[in-house]
């Protein structure tokens, strides 16, 4: 077999491998390259290629572990599992070494030694436990030997291809390692106070921009597409969260639509091209990779939050029954939860107030044409009610009290605690909690309530944790609900 035929044959193997990775079929991808590697080792056809295949086998393990999110689960008490980062670092070094080795222009004709196909590195227990993957699959070591094809005038074509491919795979595993750090940061921040989504979105945007023109070889298209759709969908959702917290209707809606489009493409990539038109071939949710499942849940969470924050605007386009039906289909129906809190605790009303002071482009009714000049709100109108239950409750008599509490108790509210205030003159009790830096939820009662009322406090804390995003980002860790 001459070099050209060999390269054509191995390209088909690589195409199948990367297609399997793109469809999240990691076991098949690993099996494909291991089978070909073993065949090359037996015939001594090309050792350099077999070393690349060994590294790709290890990469399939890393990719499966990455998509499972198992690396976010602690390895032991107060000890992080760093096995995936170690695996990507080993792959980074190996692809860099193979790239440099393939670039060498002084081939030596010899047969690979018996140790050429022997293991040098064993994957971590957490990586091994994910599947039936072999526990001794490793990254191989390249000696200075090459195959008989090195004597062919066409051998430099093969070496150039391998050098280029390994260089691009090196860029890919570096990008993956940054993504691992990003998800780890997302989960860690979910355990604390109000998350800084603007900073997180900027970090993710930087990862996307830096890798936009990297690992672009046609054979890597399935890998590149999956990488791009994953991070772009997540970035649009984070941007939507930032805009929701600023009560920007149109911009938030556009980012949600973009996220929906990316997720549609990514979910479709779970199916092989020939099966995409067959409804019965759709994968069940319990068979989706954990990361895919989580980002779909995040999308549902953002739609629910968008519906809550812009309920007044959306309800003008639908009947009350249609809004109820739409809400019942959501993963979390925030409006129904607020209604339940109001009814069970006998509240006069539960409202969400937005602090519009200093917000550029603020407009109470959704979209505003750029040429339309809108006066900045003043007085109590600078704290508009963006949601109220009962929806017909429009009394402004409590607004001055609420604004005073928000202003005087800002430190307590920003610490994410429940703030209680009783107005003895009006005989009204107020419970307040921050949902976003500019959004406060308040429950108003017509009698004196205990500030430690278990039901009211627990319900408001749970609602706040969900709406802020701490709950959904905490679900990054497998097993968290």
What kind of feature is each model-predicted range?
Residues 1-481:
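Intrinsically disordered, Ser/Thr-rich regulatory regions of eukaryotic membrane-trafficking proteins
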């Amino acid at each position: 077999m001459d070099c050209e035929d060999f390269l054509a044959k191995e390209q088909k193997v690589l195409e199948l491998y990367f297609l399997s990775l793109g469809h999240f079929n990691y076991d098949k991808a690993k099996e494909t390259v291991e089978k070909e590697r073993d065949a090359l080792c037996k015939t001594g056809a090309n050792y350099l290629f077999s070393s690349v295949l060994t590294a790709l086998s290890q990469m399939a393990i890393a990719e499966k572990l990455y998509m499972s999110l198992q690396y976010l689960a602690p390895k032991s008490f107060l000890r992080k599992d760093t096995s995936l980062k170690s695996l990507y670092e080993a792959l980074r070094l190996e692809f860099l070494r193979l790239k440099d080795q393939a670039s060498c222009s002084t081939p030596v004709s010899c047969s690979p030694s018996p140790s050429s196909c022997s293991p040098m590195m064993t994957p971590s227990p957490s990586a091994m436990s994910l599947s039936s993957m072999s526990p001794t699959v490793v990254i191989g070591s390249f000696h200075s030997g090459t195959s008989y094809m090195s004597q062919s005038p066409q051998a430099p074509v093969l070496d150039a291809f391998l050098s280029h491919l390994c260089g691009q795979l090196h860029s890919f595993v570096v990008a993956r390692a940054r993504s691992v750090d990003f998800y780890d940061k997302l989960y860690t921040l979910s355990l604390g106070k109000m998350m800084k989504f603007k900073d997180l979105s900027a970090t993710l945007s930087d990862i996307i921009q830096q890798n936009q023109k990297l690992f672009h070889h046609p054979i890597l298209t399935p890998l590149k597409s999956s990488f791009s759709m994953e991070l772009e969908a997540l970035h649009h959702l984070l941007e939507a969260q930032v805009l929701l917290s600023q009560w920007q209707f149109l911009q938030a809606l556009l980012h949600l639509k973009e996220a929906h489009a990316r997720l549609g493409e990514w979910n479709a990539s779970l199916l092989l091209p020939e099966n995409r038109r067959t409804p019965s071939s759709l994968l069940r949710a319990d068979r989706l990779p954990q990361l895919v499942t989580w980002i779909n849940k995040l999308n549902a969470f953002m739609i629910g939050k968008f519906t809550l924050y812009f309920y007044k605007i959306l309800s003008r386009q639908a009947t009350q029954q249609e809004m109820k039906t739409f809400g019942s289909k959501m993963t979390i129906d925030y409006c129904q939860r607020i209604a339940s809190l109001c009814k069970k605790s006998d509240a006069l009303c539960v409202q969400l107030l937005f602090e519009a002071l200093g917000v550029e482009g603020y407009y109470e009714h959704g979209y505003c044409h750029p040429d339309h000049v809108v006066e900045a709100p003043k007085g109590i109108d600078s704290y508009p009610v963006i949601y109220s239950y009962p929806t017909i409750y429009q009394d402004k008599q409590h607004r001055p009290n609420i604004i005073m509490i928000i202003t005087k108790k800002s430190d307590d509210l920003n610490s994410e605690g429940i703030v209680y205030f009783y107005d003895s003159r009006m005989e009204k009790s107020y419970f307040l909690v921050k949902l976003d830096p500019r959004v406060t939820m308040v429950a108003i009662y017509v009698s004196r309530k205990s500030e430690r009322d278990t039901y009211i406090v627990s319900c408001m804390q749970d609602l706040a944790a969900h709406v802020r995003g701490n709950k959904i980002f905490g679900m990054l860790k497998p097993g968290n609900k």
